[in-house]
C-alpha cells in the first residue's frame, strides 16, 4: 500500500484520472489488481491509499504492465505526491469474511503493539474471530500485519460496511451478539478484560 497526497487544486483531475485508469485496466484478469480508497477521517483525511492486492508476495517479481503504468503516470501521477510504501500480509486465521459480505466503506484501525504484548494482542484477535463466526456476524473483518516498510509491530484491522448506514447497523445488534458470544465462550466480562489487556500492549 502507498499513501497518495493530492496536490492543492488537483483533486478533480486526480479522481478523473483514477476512474479512467480503473475502467480501462482493472477489468482484465491479466492486469495487476489495484484498488484506490479515499481516506475520510483521521490525520490523512482527504488523502488516498492505493493498494495492490496479491495472492502471493511472489507476484512482486512480475512488473506491472508497462502500458498500464504509463497510462497511470499520464492521467494520475502528476496530481499527487507519494508517501511511504508498505507491504501487508493478510492473516486468514484471524480474518472473518462471511459469504456474500461486501461493502464500499472500510473502517481501518491501525495498532502498534509492544513486543511484550504480542500474546495478549493476538489472543484477543483469535477470540474475536471465533466469536464472530459462532455468533453469525455478517460483515467482513480482515486482519493484516505489516511485513515490510513499518517501524514497529503494526497491524491493521479492516471492517467492511455497506456505507455509513451499514456501519451503524453492524455496530448495533450484531456487535452486541458477538460480545455476548465472546463472554459465553471465554467467561463473564472476558471481552472487556481482554480489550483492556490489548490497550496495555499498545
For the regions a language model picked out, list residue spans one by one:
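Short S/T/G/P-rich N-terminal loop/turn motif that feeds into the first structured element of a domain
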Residues: 1-202
Amino acid at each position: 500500500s502507498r499513501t497518495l497526497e493530492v496536490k492543492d487544486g488537483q483533486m478533480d483531475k486526480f479522481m478523473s484520472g483514477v476512474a479512467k485508469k480503473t475502467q480501462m485496466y482493472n477489468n482484465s484478469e491479466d492486469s495487476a489488481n489495484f484498488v484506490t480508497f479515499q481516506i475520510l477521517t483521521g490525520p490523512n483525511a482527504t488523502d488516498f491509499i492505493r493498494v495492490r492486492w496479491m495472492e502471493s508476495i511472489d507476484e512482486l517479481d512480475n512488473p506491472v504492465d508497462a502500458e498500464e503504468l504509463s497510462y497511470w503516470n499520464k492521467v494520475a501521477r502528476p496530481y499527487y505526491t507519494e508517501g511511504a510504501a508498505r507491504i501487508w500480509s493478510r492473516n486468514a486465521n484471524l480474518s472473518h469474511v462471511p459469504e456474500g459480505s461486501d461493502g464500499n466503506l472500510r473502517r481501518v484501525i491501525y495498532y502498534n503493539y509492544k513486543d511484550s504484548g504480542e500474546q495478549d494482542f493476538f489472543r484477543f484477535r483469535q477470540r474475536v474471530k471465533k466469536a464472530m463466526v459462532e455468533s453469525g456476524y455478517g460483515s467482513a473483518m480482515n486482519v493484516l500485519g505489516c511485513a515490510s516498510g513499518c517501524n514497529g509491530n503494526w497491524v491493521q484491522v479492516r471492517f467492511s460496511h455497506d456505507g455509513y448506514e451499514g456501519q451503524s447497523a453492524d455496530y448495533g445488534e450484531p456487535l452486541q451478539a458477538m460480545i455476548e458470544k465472546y463472554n459465553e465462550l471465554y467467561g463473564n466480562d472476558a471481552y472487556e478484560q481482554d480489550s483492556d489487556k490489548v490497550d496495555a500492549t499498545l
